[in-house]
């Protein structure tokens, strides 16, 4: 009775527990020969459960690639080069995908190639065996060229004029400059020429000092003279002020004479 109910060839009936979900990734149960389809098989669940790859969506880059190849602004980079690189990349990617899908032998690793695993993967720009692997380098070179041209087009502030490279002027090394600077020194201290220069320098210094002293003395003498004259002028002003005050007092003390004509009359 129990053997008939739980046989492997007949479906299980009357079980009080719910049916377990099918194990999609158990290799032991999928590859066993001589077993029929179970009730929880992938074929039966396909109509009720959503597909495994419904959420995944493939992105078609052909429109972007064609638009990039047709852009006329990239004058520095050749458009045919972009088109050839993109087409060769697509062809290589398609051939690799067919080879992996058909289950053929993988390409043996050679010089400049990388051995691919049994799992399928999308073509990467960094793969050394892809013919389109030179595209990022070409794009980087073009971008650097555009940036350098844009920087050269911008006005730069004027700098100090530099001598032209083709000028016949001698280019002196630092050692030569030092030697020349060392050669410009004066004569030795014990030589008569050095003594003569030193005497001339001392005489010039003495003359300048004496001239400054004379100017200082002259200024001091002028200052003394002007101070004395100023003092004399102050004394003169004080004397005149005192005389004026005495005259006023004298005229105030005099009596008015009766024979004087009235004010405003012409006396002759």
Curated annotation (Swiss-Prot):
Superkingdom assignment: Eukaryota
Compartments (UniProt record): Nucleus
Biological process per Gene Ontology, one example term: negative regulation of DNA-templated transcription
List of residues that carry N-acetylserine: 2
Region (Basic motif) residue spans: 195-222
Compositionally biased region (Basic and acidic residues): 177-201
Main location: nucleus
Gene3D superfamilies with a match to the protein in the record: 1.20.5.170
Positions of the UniProt region annotated as Disordered: 1-48, 97-132, 152-219
Entry keywords, A to Z: Acetylation, Activator, DNA-binding, Isopeptide bond, Nucleus, Transcription, Transcription regulation, Ubl conjugation
Residue spans crossing the bilayer: none
Glycyl lysine isopeptide (Lys-Gly) (interchain with G-Cter in SUMO) crosslink, residue number(s): 120
Start-end of Pro residues biased regions: 155-167
Segments for region (Leucine-zipper): 226-254
Domain bZIP: 191-254
Molecular function GO labels: DNA binding; DNA-binding transcription activator activity, RNA polymerase II-specific; identical protein binding; RNA polymerase II cis-regulatory region sequence-specific DNA binding; transcription cis-regulatory region binding
Presence of the UniProt keyword Transmembrane helix in the record: no
InterPro entries: bZIP, bZIP_sf, C/EBP, C/EBP_chordates
Task performed by this protein: Transcription activator that recognizes two different DNA motifs: the CCAAT homology common to many promoters and the enhanced core homology common to many enhancers. Important transcription factor regulating the expression of genes involved in immune and inflammatory responses. Transcriptional activator that enhances IL6 transcription alone and as heterodimer with CEBPB.
Family to which this protein belongs: Belongs to the bZIP family. C/EBP subfamily.
Annotated PANTHER family: CCAAT/ENHANCER BINDING PROTEIN, CCAAT_ENHANCER-BINDING PROTEIN DELTA
Subunit structure: Binds DNA as a homodimer and as a heterodimer. Can form stable heterodimers with CEBPA, CEBPB and CEBPE. Directly interacts with SPI1/PU.1; this interaction does not affect DNA-binding properties of each partner. Interacts with PRDM16.
The protein, known as: CCAAT/enhancer-binding protein delta
């Amino acid at each position: 009775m129990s053997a008939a109910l739980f046989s492997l060839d007949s479906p299980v009936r009357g079980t009080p527990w719910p049916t377990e979900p099918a194990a999609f990734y158990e290799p032991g149960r999928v590859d066993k020969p001589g077993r029929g389809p179970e009730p929880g098989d992938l074929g039966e669940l396909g109509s009720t459960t959503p597909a495994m790859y419904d959420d995944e969506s493939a992105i078609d880059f052909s429109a972007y690639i064609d638009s990039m190849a047709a852009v006329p602004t990239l004058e520095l980079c050749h458009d045919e080069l972009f088109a050839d690189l993109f087409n060769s990349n697509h062809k290589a990617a398609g051939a690799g995908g067919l080879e992996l899908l058909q289950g053929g032998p993988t390409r043996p690793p050679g010089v400049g190639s990388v051995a691919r695993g049994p799992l399928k993967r999308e073509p990467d720009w960094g793969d050394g065996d892809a013919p389109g692997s030179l595209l990022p380098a070409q794009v980087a070179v073009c971008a650097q060229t555009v940036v350098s041209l844009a920087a050269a087009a911008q006005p730069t502030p004027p700098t100090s004029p530099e001598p032209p490279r083709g000028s016949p002027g001698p280019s002196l090394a630092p050692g030569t400059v030092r030697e020349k600077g060392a050669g410009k020194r004066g004569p030795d201290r014990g030589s008569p020429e050095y003594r003569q220069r030193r005497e001339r320098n001392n005489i010039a210094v003495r003359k300048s000092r004496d001239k400054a002293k004379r100017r200082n003395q002259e200024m001091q003498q002028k200052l003394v003279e002007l101070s004395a004259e100023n003092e004399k002028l102050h004394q003169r002003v004080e004397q005149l002020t005192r005389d004026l005050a005495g005259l006023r007092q004298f005229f105030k003390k005099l009596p008015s004479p009766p024979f004087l004509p009235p004010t405003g009359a012409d006396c002759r």
